[in-house]
Amino acid sequence: MVETDLMSSHSSNWKEIFRTHSIAQTIQLEKFVSQQIEEKGRELQQNVCFNYQSFIEASENLSNIRNNLEKVLQNSYEFQSMVSLPKVDRVSKFLSDNESISQTSGDYFIFLQRFYAHAILFVMELFNKEQYLQSSKLLIFCLRILPADLPNDHQCHILVNRLESCKNYLNNRLKQAMTSSLSKVSVVTSWILLNQANISSGLDIFLQECEDQLLILNDAREFSLTFLNTLKLARDFPNEIRSYLEASKNFNIFKEKEILRNICLDECYLKAYFSAEDVKVTTPFETLQQFDGDNILQQWKLSFFSKISHSEKSFFSNATSLTTLYQILEGLLSELSEPQFKEFYELWNSILQNHFIISSRNIIDSLGLYVNKIKEKLQICFEIPPTNSFDPWSFQLKQQVLNELKQNILPACGMDDGFQRFWQSLASFDMVLDESLQVLKKLQTLHLSFTLGDIIPNYLTLADYLLNFVKTSFAQIYELVCSFVNNVAVMESSSEKQLRTSRCLKIVRLLKQFRHMDESVPFDDLIYKLQNILVRELTDFTTGIYINESKINLDVAACITGNFFGPSFALYNSLIMLIDKLEVLGFDIVSDKFKGLLTPNLFESLFILNLERLKAAKSMDHMKQNTFDMEFINYLSDFTNNPREVIDYQHFIELIDLHVQDEFSKEDFDTVRANVKECVPKLLSFFTVLLPRVKAQKVIT
């Protein structure tokens, strides 16, 4: 301290010092001055981070001082032999110019605080710009220069905690970026550098983060593509990571001009405060060693498949039908590249297959619920009475307007708007089942396994399960409808006639929706039984009209013009009214098959009635008229699928009565028959509705 005071008291008179002190004392003084300059430099560095511009100016001044001082040190030996006034004057002037430098020691810890304040912010800035490697390298540099022997006080703890928090934050952000960032290799490499880990550890962390993301995915397509892409990245990572690590092996912050500029450092400060080892980010040798990546991936897949299998996921739950289920799978397969198929098959056999089968089973089971609703609706549809007291068979279409048809006939037949929609839903159900069967056939072309196992026991394939469902469901429907048909068949009283007809029409329309669904269920037999009931109703209706008209219109003069006969009023009116009823029923009921059942029964009944009338004929005109009607019926039968046998004159006489042979000669019979042949082409177009479609077209032409 005495020496310090002495030197301080004579600092303004350097010439006197040199004259009164030895060379050794002068060198000692030079060292002291150098120490003072260095301390002053550190003091200036403490303030540099507060003001960038001031720092630049101070650094330039300090650089000049240090350069001058280095020259003094390099030539200090000259002081021993060249103590001349000019030299003393120059040294005195130099030191006098810098006498404002503080003589107190600089605080390295204060410098670190100010340095970290800039550096940590820039670390975050680099990371947010997705410059992951630069961000990690800078943070590693910050951690490396932190002294191990910092004072154990509150400020030091704060500084250490800030750095550790920054490292933890970067670690978490890097893990998140492993799945969200496009530059995944850079992210994983940054994590390895930051944690001084090896490639195996980096790959484990990457797979773990990808696993967390995969576990929250529920869409089969997104899940599969993400999984396969993860495997591809994991296989490609090692070589790419090695390239990044090799490039970062000798990272030197002196060469990162942008980093230095943003954290307010330049080369002279780095040299002043840091060693060469401090500014390097080295990579441990074991990081670059070979490792068994395939084994890591295989172990991860086994663990991942186990977690997925024990989860409550349902990858195909968004599929509402087997068609959409197939479209999801087909679309997924179309997006796969050839190298990915092998790994997809492994994923399919381990995870997706069971989910696909479960979703298929759920869809098929939901169709079972639909069947139960159909059965409930059928019960209601069958039991509900006609909406009014309208009798479909007593209604003459030509006497009513179209809106009455909608208001009366259709509701009476169970075909109001609500039931119409019900029929449409049945047709839609038929289409769904047909599409489902087609889908199961398509699945067999995908070369994928569909092992049912314990998910659907007792069945070999999904197709077997669906076919059994169809058979069982429609067997239940058949049993229910069969009870309806039996109920209708025993309704014979006149009071039940209207209800029987209404229910007949309902059930026939219903069965037409079902009969194509399952060939093993005899819906056609029920339709045939109901059609026979309707045929009996129509035949009774027509013959009843014929009998009533025959009683009312006894005069046949209007039907005879000279030797030409036309059909009787009774026959004509009964057939026209029958045609009205067929038009009311609609073409969905009155099919060619139905006409094939109706016309033989109808024409047979009308033929027998004509024979009875012939036997009871009271005049030749009546006999000729009834003969005309009988022959006309036979000619109509020729245009059906069941033509009647042609009757000659002798057989005709035997059928009616032999005693009239003299009254009704063969010439009369042939004349009537010729009139029938002439009349049929003129009148047949009125009756084509009665004929099967092919026959009707033949008649029209």
Curated annotation (Swiss-Prot):
Keywords: Cytoplasm, Golgi apparatus, Membrane, Nucleus, Protein transport, Transport
Keyword Membrane set for record: yes
Membrane topology: Peripheral membrane protein
GO cellular component entries: cytosol; Golgi apparatus; Golgi membrane; Golgi transport complex; nucleus
Protein's GO biological process: protein transport; retrograde transport, vesicle recycling within Golgi
Cellular compartments annotated: Cytoplasm; Nucleus; Golgi apparatus membrane
PANTHER family: CONSERVED OLIGOMERIC GOLGI COMPLEX SUBUNIT 1
Subunit structure: Component of the conserved oligomeric Golgi (COG) complex which consists of eight different proteins cog1-cog8.
Biological role: Acts as essential component of the peripheral membrane COG complex that is involved in intra-Golgi protein trafficking. COG is located at the cis-Golgi, and regulates tethering of retrograde intra-Golgi vesicles and possibly a number of other membrane trafficking events.
Membership in a protein family: Belongs to the COG1 family.
Protein name: Conserved oligomeric Golgi complex subunit 1
Encoding gene, per UniProt annotation: cog1
